[in-house]
């Protein structure tokens, strides 16, 4: 009789990967990265264990939005005070903080739980082509 095996967090070996976001479409890249951060690409995926990889994204300011989303996609923030709703377009978000578009898209695709918080900490996004994680020898990863 076969038994289902579950991976323990001590058995997980996290790998480092670097992704160049230049000329990549925001939603497709975000979905790919979110899946990698959760570890869903592994055949022994266990939903209650942080088994995802560590992902470094460079050139986040050069990400693409399709159609007219640059001006029509809206991001909402609320301060918690009456009348404190702030609405910004994707163009305004990119001008103010270029990595916010990508981080927010990826964070929205990861569960909002304690485990999701751990998985979000494995994401490193940089607006330029340089990153400080050369000591980890990250492998280059191509998005499909």
UniProtKB/Swiss-Prot annotation:
Signal peptide: none annotated. The keyword Transferase does not apply. One of its GO terms (cellular component) is cytosolic large ribosomal subunit. It comes from the Bacteria. GO terms for biological process: negative regulation of translation; translation. Keywords: Ribonucleoprotein, Ribosomal protein. GO terms for molecular function: mRNA binding; structural constituent of ribosome. This protein is one of the early assembly proteins of the 50S ribosomal subunit, although it is not seen to bind rRNA by itself. It is important during the early stages of 50S assembly. Belongs to the universal ribosomal protein uL13 family. Part of the 50S ribosomal subunit. NCBIfam families: rplM_bact (TIGR01066). This is Large ribosomal subunit protein uL13. It comes from Mesomycoplasma hyopneumoniae (strain 232) (Mycoplasma hyopneumoniae). The lineage of its organism: Bacteria, Bacillati, Mycoplasmatota, Mycoplasmoidales, Metamycoplasmataceae.
